[in-house]
């Protein structure tokens, strides 16, 4: 049986190579996804698992699927750079931000999403930014001095 060995996030310090050269935002130092030089709308959205069947490359690749379907991207983002460059747009990973998850889990999933998107952006992919949030800890300042969900996303 030739199974790919799955690596844990902590095996190498949460993939420090993903944020080499990145800018960071806020107290939590969330990696920044830079604003695009122009605002355009994708022709459509193609789920990651269906990207091989995409008719054109003017679609945005998205990750609005269960996390295990794109786990390989989380494990080895570099393996997908060339594949993702074929498309005009790439949305950040949609790592689940369960509202009943501890705040630390919500923050690490947001961090991973921004770190990988920032990495792809620095490697030639056009990132179509999006803000995501979990429970009220992530989108208000009632519990934390910054709105965590919006860190790392350039706001107009």
Regions from the language model: what does each represent?
Residues 1-11:
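Intrinsically disordered, low-structural-confidence terminal and linker regions
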Residues 10-82, 101:
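Non-catalytic, usually N-terminal nucleic-acid engagement modules in DNA/RNA processing proteins
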């Amino acid at each position: 049986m030739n199974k790919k060995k799955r690596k844990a996030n902590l095996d190498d310090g949460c993939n420090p190579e993903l944020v080499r050269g990145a800018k960071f935002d806020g107290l939590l130092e969330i990696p920044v996804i830079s604003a695009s030089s122009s605002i355009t709308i994708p022709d459509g959205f193609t789920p990651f698992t269906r990207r091989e069947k995409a008719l054109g490359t003017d679609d945005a690749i998205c990750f609005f699927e269960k996390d295990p379907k794109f786990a390989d991207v989380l494990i080895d983002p570099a393996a997908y750079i060339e594949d993702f460059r074929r498309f005009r747009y790439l949305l950040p990973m949609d790592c689940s931000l369960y509202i009943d998850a501890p705040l630390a889990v919500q923050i690490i999933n947001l961090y991973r999403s921004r770190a990988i998107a920032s990495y792809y952006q620095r490697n030639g992919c056009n990132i179509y930014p999006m803000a995501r949030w979990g429970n009220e800890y992530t989108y208000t300042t009632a519990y934390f001095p910054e709105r965590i969900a919006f860190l790392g996303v350039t706001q107009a």
